[in-house]
């Protein structure tokens, strides 16, 4: 049987980090087994579902590189199908109409709570065999078995079972003809021939109800795998403040999609002590039943380390487009400065994110805005002008502007003046960047460009003369 997995987000919000991990695990399981990965948009919550959220989910999936093997399935385009299946259950005596008012249902709930029982529908309409009538309270309820147990072997959690007496007759179709969650997903997974249902463990309590529906429909039962939660760094439930953000906010923060994928896969799965995987290695090695049953903790420092690894090792040509995007987000005209690939080579060892890289790269694309006064006091003081003037003369006279020629000019300055290279590099570093920290000084000057470098040296000389 061909493995078919699905990711089924609800477009009531954007794709968050937990959803992205679920999608990744579904994708990897299907790819390893040469199966199919499908996408379903569960958009039946008409009040909260938005097209903007749908677009954002699709965009995030594309950014992460999680391709799917058929056009997305939209639940709102399948309302007729849900009604057909509900009608079949009615005809077979496996479901029934109920017309209980909200007040009646609230009274049932309150009565159960007063006696310390679990709130549940009391089955008042189960045996009444009520006919269809036009009523705003009309729902269709599933006749859940009263006896026996529901048991299944979860690929992650192990054996799970529950007595049917713990379950009530759930609503499967609302008054407006829209399905409830538990009904829709069973019909969808059946029609989509899903073989493995991989989802968060917040759905475990839904699974016994869904299994009873599968049995009632005579549908083949998929295998279930319920993923543990992702907690924040303190072990609490994730919030937007602690990491449960829209996946695209990680892009905006400067993380690479393959770095995020590499990090996410390790939140619950491992292959020995190996930390870094390319995508093909993940496809070859990942197995859903190897996922840990315990909750994982988000570790932003580890994500930063993984991202930095790829910044250091990826081909600069592949990093250039996302760096350009980050520079443009800062209002920078990239054509006004050095090649992005050169910037990457200069900064890749010094930053963890592309956002940091873009911030540090501003010195090569924008006029120097300010000086670090501590750096000025330490390095732009009387006497420093000699080295700056000599370096300026040699830089201005270079036949071609290359990093090697710039380096030679600076070393020649130190040799000629019989001073250490630091006596040349540090005043020049402050003149060019406004600070006393930068990449290799020759590379820093080279990326600034001849005209702009000379202009900044002149400004530093004026600053020294007026100190």
Swiss-Prot record:
Keywords in alphabetical order: Aminoacyl-tRNA synthetase, ATP-binding, Cytoplasm, Ligase, Nucleotide-binding, Protein biosynthesis
Which PROSITE patterns does the entry link to? AA_TRNA_LIGASE_I
Q: Coiled-coil annotation: which residues? A: none
Molecular function (GO) terms for this protein are: ATP binding; glutamate-tRNA ligase activity; tRNA binding; zinc ion binding
Provide the residue positions that the database annotates as binding ATP: 240
Tell where it localizes.
Answer: Cytoplasm
Gene Ontology terms describing biological process? glutamyl-tRNA aminoacylation
What is the recorded name of this protein?
Answer: Glutamate--tRNA ligase
Keyword Metal-binding recorded:
no
Question: Motif 'KMSKS' region: which ranges?
Answer: 237-241
Which InterPro entries does the UniProt record give?
A: aa-tRNA-synth_I_cd-bd, aa-tRNA-synth_I_codon-bd_sub2, aa-tRNA-synth_I_CS, aa_tRNA-synth_I_cd-bd_sf, Glu-tRNA-ligase_bac/mito, Glu/Gln-tRNA-synth, Glu/Gln-tRNA-synth_Ib_cat-dom, GluQ/Sye
Known partners and oligomeric status = Monomer.
Q: Report the family membership.
A: Belongs to the class-I aminoacyl-tRNA synthetase family. Glutamate--tRNA ligase type 1 subfamily.
Q: Motif 'HIGH' region: which ranges? A: 9-19
Enumerate the catalysed reactions: tRNA(Glu) + L-glutamate + ATP = L-glutamyl-tRNA(Glu) + AMP + diphosphate
Q: Which Gene3D superfamilies match?
A: 1.10.10.350, HUPs (3.40.50.620)
**NCBIfam families for the chain:** gltX_bact
Key word Isomerase present: no
Q: What does this protein do?
A: Catalyzes the attachment of glutamate to tRNA(Glu) in a two-step reaction: glutamate is first activated by ATP to form Glu-AMP and then transferred to the acceptor end of tRNA(Glu).
């Amino acid at each position: 049987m061909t493995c078919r997995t699905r990711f089924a987000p609800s477009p009531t919000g954007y794709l968050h980090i937990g959803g992205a991990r679920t999608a990744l695990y579904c994708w990897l399981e299907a790819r390893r087994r040469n199966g199919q990965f499908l996408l379903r948009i569960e958009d039946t919550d008409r009040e909260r579902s938005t097209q903007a959220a749908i677009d954002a989910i699709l965009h995030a999936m594309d950014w992460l590189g999680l391709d799917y093997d058929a056009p997305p399935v939209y639940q709102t385009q399948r309302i007729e199908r849900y009604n057909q299946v509900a009608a079949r259950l009615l005809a077979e005596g496996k479901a029934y109409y109920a017309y209980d008012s909200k007040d009646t249902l609230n009274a049932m709930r309150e009565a159960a709570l007063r006696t310390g029982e679990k709130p549940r529908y009391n089955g008042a309409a189960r045996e009444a065999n009520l006919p269809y009538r036009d009523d705003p309270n009309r729902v269709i309820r599933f006749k859940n078995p009263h006896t026996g147990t529901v048991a299944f072997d979860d690929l992650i959690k192990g054996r799970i079972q529950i007595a049917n007496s713990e379950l009530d007759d759930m609503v499967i179709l609302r008054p407006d003809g829209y399905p409830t969650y538990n009904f829709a997903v069973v019909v969808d997974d059946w029609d989509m021939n899903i073989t493995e249902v991989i989802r968060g463990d917040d759905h475990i309590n839904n699974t016994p109800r869904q299994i009873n529906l599968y049995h009632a429909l005579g549908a083949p039962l998929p295998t279930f795998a319920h993923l543990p939660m992702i907690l924040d760094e303190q072990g609490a439930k994730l919030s937007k403040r602690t990491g449960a953000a829209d996946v695209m906010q990680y892009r905006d923060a400067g993380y690479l999609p393959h770095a995020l994928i590499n990090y996410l896969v390790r939140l619950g799965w491992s292959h020995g002590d190996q930390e870094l995987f390319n995508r093909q290695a993940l496809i070859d090695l990942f197995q859903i039943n190897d996922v840990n049953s315990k909750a994982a903790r988000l570790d932003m420092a580890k994500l930063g380390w993984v991202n930095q690894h790829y910044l250091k090792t990826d081909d600069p040509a592949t990093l250039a487009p996302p760096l350009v995007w980050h520079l443009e987000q800062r209002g920078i005209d990239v054509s006004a400065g050095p090649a992005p690939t050169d910037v990457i080579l200069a900064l890749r060892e010094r930053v963890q994110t592309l956002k940091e890289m873009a911030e540090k790269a501003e010195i090569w694309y924008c006029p120097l805005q300010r000086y670090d006064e501590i750096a000025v006091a330490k390095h732009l003081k009387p006497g420093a002008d000699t080295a700056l003037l000599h370096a300026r003369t040699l830089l201005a006279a270079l036949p071609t502007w290359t990093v090697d020629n710039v380096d030679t000019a600076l070393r020649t300055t130190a040799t000629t003046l019989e001073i250490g290279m630091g006596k040349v590099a540090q005043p020049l570093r402050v003149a060019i960047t406004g600070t006393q920290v930068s990449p290799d000084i020759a590379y820093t000057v080279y990326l600034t460009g001849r005209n702009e470098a000379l202009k900044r040296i002149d400004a530093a000389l004026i600053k020294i003369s007026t100190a």
